[in-house]
Amino acid sequence: ISPADFAINHPAGSLGKQLTMTVADLMLPVSSLPALQPSTSMPDVISMLTQGAIGSGWVEDPGSRGRLVGLITDGDLRRALKENNSDRWAHLQASDLMTADPITVTSELMAVEAMKRMEHNRRKPISVLPVVNAHGQLEGLLRLHDLVQAGLT
């Protein structure tokens, strides 16, 4: 029996999940995510990330609705707080905090491949991957947490 046939007959098992589950199956849809503008103030970024309870927010191109230009995670926020003295915090904007042009994936990618990209990133570990369409518009976010919860370890 081939791995693909096994996956069809045992979709809930680890091998079945690895061979059948896509990013689309696990991503958080864009409608549930806080959207930020590059000019969003630091206090508003903190408020939106706290309300969202997702640990990240996406920054959209103000001239092209829905097009991703950056991503802000809890880690980006902590680094900005550490690197800037407190009298500068109120003057920071989303564009100062965000990871510009983050690594992205498409919704059709196999979830296990997305997990490998997160684990083996050269610059720093990735806990959140933006999911975009062919036009760079955000479709959702894929969190490492969701991959682990789905049993893709």
Please describe what each predicted stretch is.
Residues 1-24, 40-42:
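Active-site phosphate/pyrophosphate-binding segments
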Residues 35-54, 60, 81, 104-126, ...:
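The conserved cystathionine-beta-synthase
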Residues 26, 49, 66, 97, ...:
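Terminal peptide-recognition signature
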Residues 19-33, 90-102:
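Bateman (tandem CBS) regulatory domains
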Residues 1-11, 54, 67-84, 124, ...:
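Short beta->alpha transition motifs characteristic of CBS
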Residues 45, 49, 56-93:
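A beta-strand-loop signature enriched in Asp, Gly, Thr, and Trp
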